[in-house]
Amino acid sequence: MIQVTDNHDVVTIQLTGRFDFRVIKDFQELLTREPRTWVVDLSAVDYVDSSALGMLLLLRDRVRGDAQRVQLRGVHGQPREVLVMAKFDRMFKLE
Amino acid sequence: MDEPGTLTAWIDTALAKIISDLGRARSLLKDAMSRLLETFTRLREQLLQERTLYEVTLQEVNGTAGDVGLVGVLRDVLSRCVDDMVRIGTSSVKIMMEVESLRGHTSKVAVRGQQIEKIASTTRMLSLNARIEAQRIGNAGAVFRVVADEIKSLANESGELSRAIREALAVQSASLAQTSTAVAKLASSDLDHAVTSNKKLDETIAKLAAMSARSLDIFARVQAETASALQALQFEDMLTQLLQSISDKLEIVRTACKAGAIDKLAELDRRIHRDVVTQHSLGVGTVELF
């Protein structure tokens, strides 16, 4: 499940449960927006797959690789292990 | 034979036997010590070879300054595997998004097709009305009747074409849906296995490091023990000399027991009390070299 809060400057994406290919359509719509900062809240996410990493990389491309403009919040458990192993902690601001 | 003479002869024989036994003991000891020395020397060499081989193997596994080693290669393979999975995931997500866009466009075109079909249907109705009107006005409406028939024919063709396009779009839409499902499978690779493998690799490296430290410690201790044994075996010379000295002193006793030796007792006593070896243990001591 995905919930989006948009205050123009910051778009907060709150995900719940599994972060996988089922939210690709939502992300496609989100990628048309141009906020200053993206915040992806993963505190309620307990699983990510390779498509989730792909979506995060597309968000990063959207801000031309500026790590400060994509923040990953509440990263824990399996998502943290996967993100760290894929070296995403060097590409994103992990909180 | 008188009693002192018998005793002297017996003591002389006994001493000769003891001296002979001591000679055998010295010979056996020398032989045994020599073999032990050879064995421990070979053991020390083999230990050195073993340790060198072990250290080379460890370097092959853990790597050195210029070489990443087996562990490095495994980490690199795992890292590349994860990179590839992420790359495939990203590309698949892009493809899925493109497919979704195409499906959206297809739906829009299908709606336009339905609109065209509706226009064709309306046109058919209009041509029918025109034909009825042309019929009603008789011969004067003959030309309009022909035009109305042509319009009806065009409307039919247009409707048929729109239906064909709509059917083709339905096939395309189904095909895009299948593509989307297939790409979704490609996009969603489970990375848990890679995470587990990485953890196992870390655990194995830690175990290997602990085992290496323990093995190197055992090697060092065995080497120290071997060195100590070799050092102890080097006291064989001292022991041989001591046994030789005992034999010599017994010979002096034999000489002292013989007739006419009473005048030489002072000299014999001096020789008896001369120690060639001052050592009482395997620690520091002196050996009188002959």
Region annotations inferred by a language model:
Chain A
Residues 1-14:
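Short beta-strand/loop segment at the start of cytosolic alpha/beta domains
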Residues 11-25:
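Short, conserved structural micro-motifs that define repeat-unit consensus positions
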Residues 21-91:
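Amphipathic alpha-helical interaction surfaces in cytosolic regulatory modules
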Residues 93-95:
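Short acidic-hydrophobic, aromatic-tinged amphipathic segments that line or gate anion-handling sites
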